[in-house]
Amino acid sequence: MSSRRSVGDPEYLTRRIPQNPRYQHIKTRLDTGSSLTKYIEKLEEIKRNYRYRKDELFKRLKVTTFAQLVVQVASLSDETLEVTNEEIHKLEGGNSPASDADAELTAGTNGKGSPNGTPPSPVLFINNAGAGESYRSTLQSLISGVGELDIEKDTHKKADTQAKDTPYPDCPFLLLDVRDRDAYDQCHIVGAYSYPIAMLSRAMNPYTNSILEYKNAHGKIIILYDDDERLASQAATTMCERGFENLFMLSGGLKVLAQKVPEGLITGSLPISCQVAAPTGSARKKPVPKVPPTRAESKWRYSAEDLQKIKYYLEEEQLPSDTASRLSRGSSGRDSKATTARSSPSLPSTAGSRMLSRSSIQNRPWK
C-alpha cells in the first residue's frame, strides 16, 4: 500500500513571516496580556533610561509625580496671588470715602487754600471720618490722590511682574541642576538652580544658603537631576552620606522627562542625547530643517500655557493601556452612559471628563 500523502507543505506552519523594516516601529493594538517579550522589552527600557543600584541611599521621584507637584504648587501660588491683589484693590477702594470728605472740605476754599468765610471749627475734624487728621494733612492726601493715581497703578503692575519673575514663595521643593553651568544655560527645568557637582568637592562652603535652608526641613524636599542619572546619582549619594535625609533624585533625568512631558517643564533646547529619536521606518524620509539651539530663559515660574501642556501630557500618561483596564473602562463607561441617559437626555462630553480628571490631579496632595 502506498503511504498517504498530506495536503500542502508541512513546513508551512513553521515558516516565519517576513518583516518589513518600514513598519517595524508600529506596535500592535491587540494586547494579549503579560508575556516574556514584553517583560524583556521593559527590562531593556529600564536599562536604557535608568541606572538602578541595589545600595542606593537616596530616594527616587518619578517624572509624572514631579509634574503633578509642579502643577499643584503653581496653581496654589496663582490663587494666593489673586487673593492678595483683590485685597489690595479692596483697600484702595476703601480710601475713596475719605477722599470725598476731603473734597467737601476743599469746597469752602477758593482754590488757593484760603477759606471764603469763617474757618472750620475743631469739632468738624473730631467728628470727621479721618479723626486725628489736621487740616494740612487732609489737603496733602487730596493732592496726592489726584495726581499720583496713575503712578500707583503702574507701581502695582510692576510689582505683579516682579512677583512673576521670582521663585514661588514657600515652595515645598528645591530643584538643583548638578550639570555644568554651560549645560544649565543651554537647557534646564523651569525654577531650577544651577549647582554643579564640583561644588561638593569644596573644602569651605560647599552648600548655598537655599540648600542649608531646605536641609532636613519639615515639609520640604531637595530634588537633584541631570541628563541621564550619571552625575545626579553621585551627587545624591554624597549628600545623603553627609546627612541629607529629605533628598530625592529625578528618576531618568531630562532624558525621561523629554519622553513623558516634552513641553511645559523645560526652557531652552534639549541636548541631542536627551531628544526623542524619530521612528526609523518611515514611508518617505522628509528632510527636517535644522533649528539652531535656543538658550534657556531666566524663567522661575510657569505660565498658564505651560501648565495646560503639563496637564495634557499627564492625562496621556494616566490613560490605561492594558486590555483588562480598557475593558473595565468600557464597561464602566457603558454603565455610566445608561444611568445618565435615564436621568438626563443629554450625555456628558469628553471635555467634561477631562476637566474632572484635571481637577482631581490638582486636588491630590503632594507626597
Swiss-Prot record:
Organism lineage string: Eukaryota, Metazoa, Chordata, Craniata, Vertebrata
Keywords assigned by UniProt, alphabetized: Cell projection, Ciliopathy, Cilium, Cilium biogenesis/degradation, Cytoplasm, Cytoskeleton, Protein transport, Transport
Composition bias type Polar residues, residue spans: 107-116, 338-367
Free-text function comment from the UniProt entry: Required during ciliogenesis for tubulin glutamylation in cilium. Probably acts by participating in the transport of tubulin polyglutamylases between the basal body and the cilium.
Family membership noted in the UniProt record: Belongs to the CEP41 family.
Identification of the protein by name: Centrosomal protein of 41 kDa
Coiled coil: none
Subcellular locations according to the entry: Cytoplasm, Cytoskeleton, Microtubule organizing center, Centrosome; Cell projection, Cilium; Cytoplasm, Cytoskeleton, Cilium basal body
Principal cellular location given in the protein's record: cytoplasm
GO cellular component, one term: ciliary basal body
Region (Disordered): 89-121, 319-367
GO BP annotations listed: cilium assembly; protein polyglutamylation; protein transport
Annotated transmembrane regions: none
Rhodanese domain: residues covered: 169-266
CDD domains: RHOD
Superkingdom of the organism of origin: Eukaryota
